[in-house]
Amino acid sequence: MTSTIALNYTPTIDGAASHYDDLDSFYREIWGEHVHHGMWLTGKETDTEAAENLVTLVAKLGGTGKGSDVCDVGCGYGATAKILAERYGANVTGMTISKMQWRYAQEHNDVPGKTT
């Protein structure tokens, strides 16, 4: 077994964006609209339900409510932003470096005045 370590590798924003864009369909197949792990409360939740459980916990811990301003850095496909806007009435700004994720979020998260 061999391994290689790139000692002179310098990550760039463009490189990271390309990574997410190149693996877009893979990420959506594996993660769905949530590009993060979840929280299984019973062990019987689907991956999506577990991801939404985690969003719910974070929203509660953060005191998210009607009129809250939230910046979702690394928003991926916008699923978390959509939940925070629809369920909690938050004003959410989502940020991603991936053009593919941004395009998907724009096409699938129609919450006027709440998500960008």
Residue ranges of model-derived segments:
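Conserved hydrophobic/aromatic pocket- or pore-lining residues that grip, position, or stack substrates
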Residues: Y20, V58, S98
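Short, charge-rich binding segments
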Residues: S18, K60-T64, L84-E86
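Conserved SAM/SAH-binding loop
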Residues: Y77
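Conserved alpha-helix/loop element of class I SAM-dependent methyltransferases that forms part
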Residues: E33-L41, E45-K66
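Conserved S-adenosyl-L-methionine
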Residues: G74
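N-terminal auxiliary segments of SAM/dcSAM-dependent transferases
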Residues: M1-E29
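Active-site phosphate/pyrophosphate- and oxyanion-stabilizing loops and adjacent acidic/basic residues
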Residues: S25, T56, K82
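Class I SAM-dependent methyltransferase SAM/SAH-binding core
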Residues: D69-C71, T80-T116
